[in-house]
């Protein structure tokens, strides 16, 4: 167990950038991902509370004015990832995608609070985080459940967190791909293509983004 903890710390710290952490330390995911940051923050909370709070605060810094927290924040604009910041062409203070991901930040923050004794040094940070999370949840209620059905909608497989699931095969098969659609993928060059979505799937993802 001790070796496992040690190697886990090494991975987190090895992927760390200024204020945020990459999901993988290669070109596969060269940005800050919404719910990845939540789990990363939870990991940091076991040995470095400041890093955990920095991770979440940086994510909330990319929050849109209407309350949405995007699923990607592009802090480094020089990447081969597609679709990149120029394709999405949105974001407020930080370049971002135009969709979101499952709102796990509230659960993550609660777990961190339960685990750590919070002194005055971090109270202001937690207040800022909770304020951002509340605004985020209100956004989901207003824009993703406008009829008050109690069911929040998602608009893209990437918002689900399980975009490679066969559950998407039938609905996504109805997406009409433009004949002039052109782009260059990099994800299937970094890792084994067998572990990545098929080109036809990616074409559909990009079409409806």
Where are these regions (language model features)?
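Solvent-exposed loop and edge beta-strand segments that line ligand/cofactor-binding
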Residues: 20-38, 42-46, 83-102
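Tryptophan-centered motif/residue detector
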Residues: 33-35, 107, 136-141
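Extended, hydrophobic/aromatic-rich amphipathic alpha-helical segments that build helical scaffolds
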Residues: 38, 130-137
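Acidic, low-complexity intrinsically disordered regions
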Residues: 29-31, 84, 135, 154, ...
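Helix-terminus loop motifs that line ligand-binding clefts
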Residues: 49-131, 141-144, 148-159
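Extended ligand-binding clefts on enzyme/binding-domain cores
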Residues: 137-209
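Low-complexity, Ser/Thr/Pro/Gly-enriched N-terminal "stalk/linker" regions
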Residues: 1-32, 53-54, 58, 72, ...
């Amino acid at each position: 167990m001790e070796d496992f903890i040690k190697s886990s710390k090494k991975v987190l710290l090895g992927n760390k950038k200024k204020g945020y952490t990459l999901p993988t330390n290669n070109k596969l995911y060269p940005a800050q991902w919404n719910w990845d940051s939540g789990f990363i923050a939870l990991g940091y909370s076991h040995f470095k509370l400041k890093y955990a709070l920095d991770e979440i605060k940086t994510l909330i810094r990319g929050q849109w004015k209407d309350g949405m927290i995007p699923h990607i924040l592009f802090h480094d604009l020089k990447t081969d990832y597609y679709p990149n910041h120029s394709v999405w062409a949105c974001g407020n203070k930080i370049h971002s995608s135009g969709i979101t991901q499952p709102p796990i930040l509230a659960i993550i923050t609660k777990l961190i609070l339960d685990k750590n004794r919070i002194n005055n040094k971090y109270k202001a940070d937690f207040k800022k985080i909770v304020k951002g999370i509340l605004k985020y949840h209100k956004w989901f209620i207003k824009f993703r459940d406008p009829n008050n059905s109690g069911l929040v909608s998602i608009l893209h497989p990437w918002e689900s967190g399980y975009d490679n699931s066969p559950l998407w095969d039938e609905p996504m098969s109805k997406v009409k791909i433009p004949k002039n659609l052109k782009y260059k993928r990099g994800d299937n060059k970094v890792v084994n293509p067998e572990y990545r979505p098929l080109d036809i799937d990616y074409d559909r993802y990009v079409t409806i983004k």
